[in-house]
Design a protein with these regions (language model features):
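Flavin (FAD/FMN)-binding glycine-rich loop and adjacent Rossmann-like elements that form
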Residues: 6-341
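Short, hydrophobic/aromatic-rich segments at coil-to-beta transitions
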Residues: 1-3
Length: 341
């Protein structure tokens, strides 16, 4: 691989490598390399997953522009954002303005809501899925310029929610932390993307492989390189028409092993795909997207790349056992390997 990289203050640099890893948020490198991929929900007929929709669509999960608030001990209420509508957030928690919640069985107290993401040093992470700052937009195929413009709306939506917390719920001493991100707007560099392109890999992991690993024709559990145990959790309530989608809130699954073949494109040599762009179904992405799994995917990708280069092998020729041994040598995650065996 040969890549041209514009290094800040150093001009254009050329990077050559035998193996490349796509760890982008939306699988942009995989697309540039010609890897096949899917976006949105497959149908029940495509994946044979019982909870998949009857027809495919291009709907992805809501994103969230997370904010970190800090208690300043004084009123730091921001000016009312343009277009602010408190009805958008009325049922983020139990309060007098909540009349018709979208999810009546998920209306928490405001104290539980604000402490959901409580951090040290009088700070609070605002990543609230229940009529909070989730925001629907499918920007996967947009240009960088289009994405930038679209994300301004997501940022604005989060600021509207911050104003709701301050003005409607009385948390007027909480404001954007000024010591977390070196950005002009005090927000993170990127939003939380819950869904990406999903490549066509050597294998495609789906819900059935997690629910009943030992009865499948493909014994994918034998090639496990990461484990997860979080329920299938999709965020869709900010999509207009979410009522017509499957109910994918905390669908229970057992602990599962993610197979190595999900990281390897089936038609492009020398490329490993990580993050949320691996070869999984839309449904099971609701659990493989979680950070503990994604961290393991990154470690597996690094181990796989190192072994391929060291042994002068193609990526799909590297032994999964050797990849696991590299994990074992790291010690901190060796217990995961035994769960996969």
């Amino acid at each position: 691989w040969i890549a041209k990289v514009n290094m800040e203050g150093q001009g254009m640099k050329t990077v050559r490598s035998k193996v490349m890893i796509d760890a982008t948020e939306l699988g942009d490198v995989a697309k540039m390399c010609g890897v096949g991929y899917d976006i949105g929900m497959e149908s029940k007929n495509d994946t044979h997953e019982d909870i998949a929709p009857e027809k495919p669509n291009n709907i992805v999960q809501d994103i969230t522009y997370v904010a970190i608030l800090k208690d300043y001990g004084k009123d730091v209420t921001i000016p009312e954002p343009e277009g602010y509508d408190p009805k958008e957030f009325a049922c983020a928690c139990a309060n007098p303005v909540c009349i018709t919640p979208k999810e009546p069985d998920r209306v928490w107290s405001k104290e539980m809501m604000i402490t959901y993401g409580k951090l040290p040093n009088h700070k609070y992470m605002i990543n609230w899925p229940i009529e909070g700052n989730d925001y629907y937009i499918n920007l996967i195929e947009m240009s960088p310029e289009e994405r930038g413009k679209a994300l301004e709306y997501a940022k604005h939506y989060t600021m509207c929610f911050v104003y709701f917390l301050q003005h409607e719920l009385g948390y007027n001493t909480l404001g954007l932390a000024d010591d977390e991100y070196p950005t002009e707007d005090k927000l993170p560099f990127i939003p939380y993307h819950r869904e990406s392109r999903r490549i066509h890999g050597l294998v495609r992991f789906n819900l059935n492989h997690a629910l009943n690993p030992y009865t499948q024709d493909e014994k994918l559990y034998r090639t496990c390189i990461a484990v997860g145990d979080y329920p299938v959790d999709h965020h869709h309530t900010r999509y207009h028409g979410y009522e017509e989608l499957p109910n994918l809130y905390f669908h229970p699954i057992p602990s599962y092993g993610l197979p190595l073949g999900t990281l390897i494109p089936k038609d492009v040599d020398g490329l490993i795909v990580a993050e949320k762009s691996i070869s999984v179904s839309n449904i099971i992405n609701g659990t493989t997207r979680l950070q503990p799994v994604v961290l393991q995917i990154g470690q597996a990708a690094g181990a796989l790349a190192a072994l391929a280069v060291k042994n002068n092998q193609k990526i799909d020729e590297v032994s999964v056992v050797m990849s696991r041994m590299l994990f074992w040598m790291q010690k901190d995650i060796c217990f995961l390997i035994w769960m996969c065996l």
